[in-house]
Swiss-Prot record:
Tissue: Mainly expressed in male and female strobili, and, at lower levels, in roots of seedlings and saplings.
Organism: Cryptomeria japonica
Designated name of the protein: Pathogenesis-related thaumatin-like protein 3.4
PANTHER family: OS03G0233200 PROTEIN
GO biological process, one term: defense response
Amino acid sequence: MARAILWVLLTVMAVSLLLHAGVEGVNFDIENQCPYTVWAAGTPFGGGIELKRGQSWRVNVPGGARGRFWGRTGCSFDGNGRGRCNTGDCGGLLNCQGSGGVPSTLLEYALNQYQNLDFYDISLVDGFNLRMTVVLSNTNCKRIACNSDINSKCPGELKVVDGCRSACAAFNTPAYCCTGSFLDNCPPTGYSQFFKRECPLAYSYAKDDPTSTFTCPGGSDYKIIFCGNGDSQSNSTSTSSGSLYAVE
């Protein structure tokens, strides 16, 4: 929870500067290949939108920004965009304004950082709800994915409707959340090792940086695929321009 709050504070403080900095932005194309509707979300850029199977959504994000994208499931909203979701809920709003509720599979990004590099990762620190693949238009940059059906394998004590909570979200103890006396020395637990086995390229818990954070020269566009198989070019219905991406 503390990690999510810190992330929100950092991104909110940066937004007002970035919007007027004149830095060229990059595109994030979010595509739903799931056999059901997903309500995509992005903060502090994007907000939220309903994506039926095969639909996609383009969000332009300014250079230098930090943020996250994720998918929500089991949602119901009224005409004013108010309601709730089983996973990834944003305080009952279609147009997200906060970090989103647990559990949710996250794509986290920080653009044009040290030596003009982008930093990006798939995070399961808040748990898992959807399979996710991330492909960059710069083909020299690593495609990352979490394509295991974790929900079907989730330990009973972590299982919720449509998702699998992290141990931190489920138990909220220092050992699982890497807080208090575990802030500087927080080894993996049996639960985080479960997530790591299922998705080796994703953050399995808060201190999983060495094997889970990836870099790419700034300026690359991103494609986020919900429920993609990760091994073929996808087809989607979208009003945006042609694909720049090839999934290896």
